[in-house]
A protein has these predicted regions:
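Short amphipathic alpha-helical elements of helix-turn-helix/winged-helix folds
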Residues: 28-32, 70, 109, 143, ...
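Short, basic, alpha-helical segments at the C-terminal edge of helix-turn-helix-like DNA-binding modules
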Residues: 73-79
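Helix-turn-helix
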Residues: 24, 28, 32-66, 70
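Hydrophobic/aromatic-rich alpha-helical bundle segments in the mid-to-C-terminal region
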Residues: 117-122, 130-134, 138, 152-199, ...
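Short, structured helix-loop boundary elements
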Residues: 22-23, 43, 65, 69, ...
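N-terminal intrinsically disordered/low-complexity leader segments
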Residues: 1-20, 87, 208-209
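Hydrophobic alpha-helical connector segments
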Residues: 70, 84-113, 167-170
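Short secondary-structure transition hinges
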Residues: 66, 101, 107-146, 164-165
């Protein structure tokens, strides 16, 4: 069984005037949003963090909501590309193999973009920007669930656990990395990905009696 892949939601058009230090402003904003919370962070806080004036910040961005949207889109663009690439059918590959590849790529993206993914996982739909991000997250969940269903249909995975629940548990394992993973810690991304894949798929494997 092969699932029909829906098109990914289109990212919102980004606004604002480019500037040579705009990436630095965005990085500082993401760090502050994660540390203090988005609602508790003001443009004044960001200006003080960077040693700039508020007008200097507004020269490059129109609002802190624009910064939030840009950070969320950065994370979602990477995750969408990873999921789309890993789930694409190729000659000689099974849904089970593509599913494992999707989980591995998700770990790699989270590690490479940990601050923005951390921010993404904390949004609750309190604004249009956050609602758009949640819609894109749901698309990722649906793609993973569809691939789980295909792997079940192949007979590679057990069929007594709903695919949607499996997808949430898999993403839950991957997303937990934002709480404890450190790039300078004891484990590199490949080791973490191997551990998640082993623990998850050994438990999901279908064994013949």
């Amino acid at each position: 069984m092969t699932s029909t892949e829906p098109a990914a939601p289109t990212p919102r058009r980004r606004r604002g005037r480019p500037g040579y230090d705009q990436p630095a402003i965005l990085r500082a904003a993401v760090e502050l949003f994660n540390r203090k919370g988005y609602d508790a962070t003001s443009v004044g806080d960001l200006a003080r963090e960077l040693g700039l004036t508020k007008p200097a910040i507004y020269h490059h961005v129109t609002s802190k909501e624009q910064l939030l949207g840009q950070a969320l889109d950065d994370a979602l663009d990477e995750l969408t590309a990873a999921v789309t690439e890993a789930s694409r059918e190729r000659a000689g590959t099974t849904a089970y193999e593509r599913l494992r590849a999707m989980v591995r790529r998700s770990v790699e993206v989270l590690v490479a973009h940990q601050p923005s993914v951390t921010l993404l996982l904390r949004v609750r739909g309190n604004s249009e920007v956050e609602l758009a991000a949640l819609e894109r997250r749901r698309w990722l969940d649906d793609r993973l669930a569809a691939l789980v269903a295909d792997a079940v249909a192949e007979g590679a995975l057990r069929d007594d656990v709903p695919p949607k629940l499996v997808s949430r548990l898999l993403f839950g394992m991957v997303n937990s990395l934002v709480e404890w993973y450190r790039a300078d810690g004891a484990y590199d991304p490949a080791t973490v990905a191997d551990a998640i894949i082993t623990i998850a798929f050994d438990g999901l494997a279908r064994y013949e009696p």
